[in-house]
Amino acid sequence: PIDVLLRRVLDSECDPLELDSGALAGTPGLVQAVRGGRVALANPLGSALVESPGFMGYIPAVARRLLGEELLLPSPQSWWCGRPDGLSHVLARLDDLVVEPVVTIPGGPKRYVPRLLDAAGRTALVDRIRARPGDWVGREVIERSVAPCWDGGRVVAAPVVLRLFSAATPEGPI
């Protein structure tokens, strides 16, 4: 039997019986099993909100408000363009940032690195941001570390991103 699951599927695609009948990645009956208490989700439906780029800029304030303390590991700074100060900051520092939609929609725009765009691409991105500023977030660029990786029969240095999660237990975080 399974006690706890860690989802790697979009919320909307978790259960084709209850959520999206066209979803191929989900587990039929998952929502019913969760409702009935037969399985727990380590990252419950709806928890993707916390990983939303639009929410990232508010995580330090949420931690202070809910926990009364600062984050042990800082989040990358981000600025929501739906606020006038955020929009002006993002447009003024466009080449120093990564720009991404507040909510990632399958088939929709992903993230943009403005300094890598040609003039036409950059202008198009600025126009999209100005047209619907609340849909966009600017985030500081995270310089990635490199680690040895196996590629084509040889070891090469390649960029690596490591995402870690912690779980709260009665004995403390694990």
Where are these regions (language model features)?
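Domain-scale recognition of functional cores that engage charged ligands
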Residues: P1-I174
